[in-house]
């Protein structure tokens, strides 16, 4: 069965939200004892941003959650917050992954969040992580910083390289042994993989939202570290 999703059902869906929508679908499948149910997202559901449309194509290829074919039924819900819905459903979404794991470290820094800007990392966090994973115990690992940017942009960190291709960056997640990310879609993807990185590290502000924590983190899947953002302009003297 294919269920049509009208615009406005889940708001404007971005990358992490799309995984949240899949989690809602898993709840509907479980409730109806039917693992074949799919969603057809009508135009206007997904953000028009190119990277959001591209991520939808990735999810179409990797999962059976979504159908490009229109269904015969329509979900009557409106204004459902997919993150709050987790209080009803729990964490159910699983993204199949059969890519071979490699000795690879991927860091997905977050510096340009356009909303909920507390998600943006302090500037010293990335150099700290680079130093941590440049230790001798990681000498045999490929080290990649996945980010937006030009393909020719040089990486200033010795032994590391930049990857700026959006699709390739998501492939790196599927093959990495170690993943580091913030409160954004790449982390939700990494944590939702049925065979993801062995070491999942999530960095977020201690003032961040609980309901957008990566899937399964609260059950002990992966680790979270919080950083301090000085909202009050603290003075020490």
Language-model regions, residue ranges each:
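A structural signal for isolated positions on well-ordered beta-strands in alpha/beta enzyme cores
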Residues: 2, 36-40, 106, 142-144, ...
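Conserved donor-binding/catalytic core segment of Leloir-type glycosyltransferases
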Residues: 100-116
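Short, well-ordered beta-to-alpha junction loops that form the rim of enzyme active sites
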Residues: 42-43, 109-110, 146-149
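Short acidic-hydrophobic, aromatic-tinged amphipathic segments that line or gate anion-handling sites
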Residues: 67-71, 160-163, 219-236
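Glycine- and acidic-residue-enriched helix-capping/strand-helix junction motifs
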Residues: 116-124
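Donor-binding and catalytic core of enzymes assembling or modifying cell-surface/extracellular glycoconjugates
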Residues: 4-22, 123-220
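A nucleotide-sugar donor-handling region in carbohydrate enzymes
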Residues: 58-104
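Active-site and donor-binding regions of nucleotide-sugar-utilizing enzymes
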Residues: 1-75, 168-171, 178-181, 186-192
């Amino acid at each position: 069965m294919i269920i049509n999703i009208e615009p406005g059902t889940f708001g404007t869906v971005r990358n992490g939200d799309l995984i949240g929508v899949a989690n809602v679908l898993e709840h509907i499948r479980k409730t109806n004892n039917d693992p074949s149910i799919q969603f057809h997202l009508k135009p206007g559901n997904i953000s028009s941003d190119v990277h959001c449309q591209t991520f939808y194509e990735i999810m179409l290829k990797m999962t059976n959650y979504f159908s490009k074919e229109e269904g015969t039924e329509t979900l009557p819900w409106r204004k459902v917050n997919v993150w709050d819905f987790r209080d009803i459903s729990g964490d159910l979404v699983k993204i199949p992954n059969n890519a071979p794991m490699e000795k690879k470290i991927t860091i997905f820094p977050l510096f340009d969040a356009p909303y909920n800007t507390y998600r943006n990392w302090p500037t010293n966090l990335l150099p700290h992580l680079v130093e941590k994973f440049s230790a001798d115990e990681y000498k045999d690992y490929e080290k990649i910083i996945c980010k937006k940017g030009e393909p020719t942009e040089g990486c200033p960190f010795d032994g590391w390289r930049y990857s700026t291709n959006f699709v390739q960056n998501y492939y790196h997640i599927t093959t990495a042994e170690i993943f580091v990310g913030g409160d954004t879609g790449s982390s939700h993807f990494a944590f939702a993989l049925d065979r993801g990185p062995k070491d999942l590290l999530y960095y977020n502000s201690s003032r961040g939202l609980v309901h957008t924590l990566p899937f399964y983190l609260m059950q002990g899947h992966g680790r979270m570290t919080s950083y301090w953002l000085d909202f009050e302009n603290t003075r020490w003297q």
